[in-house]
Amino acid sequence: MALDKSVILLPLLVLVLLVLGCLGRESRAKKFQRQHMDSGSSPSSNSTYCNQMMKRRSMTQGRCKPVNTFVHEPLVDVQNVCFQEKVTCKNGQTNCFKSKSSMHITDCRLTNGSRYPNCAYRTSPKERRIIVACEGSPYVPVHFDASVEDST
């Protein structure tokens, strides 16, 4: 009798643990938003912007992320890039798209000699076209691939 219950309860326990694990995991779209979206602010020439944002957005935990870009445009405008000019991603995949117009961004680059846990970044505000990888349903940005100067 006790063995019958354990045979039934064990698979149920495994299923519950799998579901709970998935619920706690950040989706690729949410990770993109956390790492790259800063819609509520303008590009800042404040030299501490990147140091503050990289720490606030959990990109200096365990290591210093070497490069990151924040986009200062409404999320819907960045999501719309997924339906603009299709381009090849840096890694050769074909799910990247380039914005049709320039966007306000801030590039953050780890300064030479900076080491974890004292991550220090150079802040560079720019206006550039962005290239993002998109996937899912709905089709949304999941990876920031690059930024390029507007050729027009």
Swiss-Prot record:
Q: Which InterPro entries match?
A: RNaseA, RNaseA-like_dom_sf, RNaseA_AS, RNaseA_domain
Which family does the similarity line name?
Belongs to the pancreatic ribonuclease family.
Task: List, from the UniProt record, the residues annotated as the active site of this protein.
Answer: 36, 143
Assembly information from the UniProt record? Monomer. Interacts with and forms tight 1:1 complexes with RNH1. Dimerization of two such complexes may occur. Interaction with RNH1 inhibits this protein.
Instruction: List UniProt keywords, sorted A-Z.
Output: Disulfide bond, Endonuclease, Glycoprotein, Hydrolase, Lyase, Nuclease, Secreted, Signal
The organism of origin for this protein: Chlorocebus aethiops (Green monkey)
**Free-text function comment from the UniProt entry:** Endonuclease that catalyzes the cleavage of RNA on the 3' side of pyrimidine nucleotides. Acts on single-stranded and double-stranded RNA.
Q: Top enzyme class of this protein?
A: lyase
For this UniProt entry, the molecular function terms from Gene Ontology, in alphabetical order, are: lyase activity; nucleic acid binding; ribonuclease A activity
What is the E.C. number?
4.6.1.18
Q: Which residues bind substrate?
A: 31, 34, 65-69, 90, 109
Where, subcellularly, is it found?
Secreted
Question: Which residues carry a glycan?
Answer: 46, 112
Recorded catalytic activity of this chain's protein: an [RNA] containing cytidine + H2O = an [RNA]-3'-cytidine-3'-phosphate + a 5'-hydroxy-ribonucleotide-3'-[RNA]; an [RNA] containing uridine + H2O = an [RNA]-3'-uridine-3'-phosphate + a 5'-hydroxy-ribonucleotide-3'-[RNA]
| Any Pfam family hit | RnaseA
This protein's name: Ribonuclease pancreatic
Name any GO cellular component annotation: extracellular region
Signal sequence region: 1-24
* Disulfide bonds, paired cysteine numbers: 50-108, 64-119, 82-134, 89-96
Q: Which SMART domains match?
A: RNAse_Pc (SM00092)
**Which superkingdom, per the lineage?**
Eukaryota
Task: Report any one BP term from Gene Ontology.
Answer: defense response to Gram-positive bacterium
